[in-house]
Amino acid sequence: MKKAQGSPALIILLIIGFAIELVTGSAGNEAALLKLGGLPDNSELHGEYWRIATYSFLHFNWLHLIVNVSLLLWIGRIVERQVGTTQAMLIYFASVLCSAALILVVHNWNPKAGATVGASGGIFGLLGAALIISCQQKGDDRLRRRLWIALLVGFTVSLFPGISMAGHAGGIVGGGLMALLVKIRMNES
């Protein structure tokens, strides 16, 4: 069984990101989070393309951070065991980028959507990858059921105000596509 190393490293980065928010007084302040690297509430990045990655290391408050860290610890380890740390981290970061892309498209249609922060796009990507990979493997029906329940709960939570449905949807699509590419590559070697 492959040992998960990427997820704990990502968790440390998320905690460091939140510590920076606390030190700068940015936690819970949308305008301050935007200055730190959140995605803007319009589709214009004004050349600040680093935001398509940095938003994922910031969190609105303690609860937001704790939920994402808990989910990353669970789902990240599953995917790392399925495909290895390097492939899992590629899936995660590709999902973050797909999440940002869909967020920016949606913000173009709804510029009052608000600034976006959080790792959930990458986490939803890992969830999508775990589902695709586990559905291709025999056995462990219990894991598949848990993943489907997590997906259902995740998208239900996405319906609440202030939660980025676009970010979650972009992440799961990116993660699912990356999982298919990773599996094809693994089958070829």
Regions found by a protein language model. Give the residues of each.
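A detector for small-residue-rich transmembrane helices and their helix-helix packing motifs
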Residues: 1-189
